């Protein structure tokens, strides 16, 4: 399965809620060198494969070969591997896409179901949706999260006046994370925008730049 959508739409929260339904291993990728990313990845896998993080893996191929050999097989339901923010890993190690393709195509890896998630629309497109993409046509489920509609904002922020709802939606859009931040602010909409966005110390002051960097 592949889940994509711009930053702050709630992909990680959705994955965490979903993973509670059955055996699952969540790996949240971060930026860094290829070696540090593999080490962190292996540490996360140790939650399912004890001792997995105690080994140094020189390549992604060796890591996934070891993973396939040790991944649980005896449960009534397969243990799912969730890789969140996959583009961080592929940006550092372009070969990882082909390694994942090999895992999906290899019958010996059928007991390792994958859920891949990412915020970079350009990179997720290149990994999964382009006809030349390594993983093209291999996902059984494709989910693209969209911003929430304006009809959801009033109840979420306890706003009743239609004009106030429209103004708030113009400021925060349909992004759940922004709504949560706005709900914790004192004062009116302008006070919240000033505190969160316009202030140099505001949580969202550099948000536009961060979103654009995701697509570099």
Label each region the model flagged.
Residues 1-216:
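Phosphate-binding site recognition
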């Amino acid at each position: 399965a592949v889940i994509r959508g711009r930053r702050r739409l709630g992909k990680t929260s959705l994955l965490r809620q979903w993973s509670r339904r059955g055996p699952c291993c969540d790996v949240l990728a971060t930026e860094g060198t290829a070696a540090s990313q593999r080490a962190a990845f292996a540490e996360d896998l140790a939650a399912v494969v004890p001792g997995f993080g105690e080994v140094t893996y020189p390549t992604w191929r060796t890591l996934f070969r070891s993973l396939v050999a040790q991944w649980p097989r005896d449960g009534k339901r397969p243990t799912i591997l969730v890789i969140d923010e996959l583009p961080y890993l592929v940006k550092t190690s372009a070969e990882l896409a082909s390694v994942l393709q090999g895992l999906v195509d290899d019958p010996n890896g059928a007991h390792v179901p994958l859920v891949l998630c990412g915020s970079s629309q350009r990179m997720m497109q290149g990994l999964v949706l382009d006809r030349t993409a390594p993983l093209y046509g291999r996902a059984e489920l494709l989910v693209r999260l969209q911003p929430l509609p304006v009809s959801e904002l009033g109840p979420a922020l306890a706003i009743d006046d239609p004009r106030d709802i429209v103004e708030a939606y113009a400021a925060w859009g349909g992004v759940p994370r922004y709504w949560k931040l706005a709900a914790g602010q004192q004062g009116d909409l302008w006070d919240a925008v000033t505190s969160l966005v316009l202030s140099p110390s505001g949580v969202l002051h550099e948000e536009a730049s961060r979103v654009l960097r995701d697509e570099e």
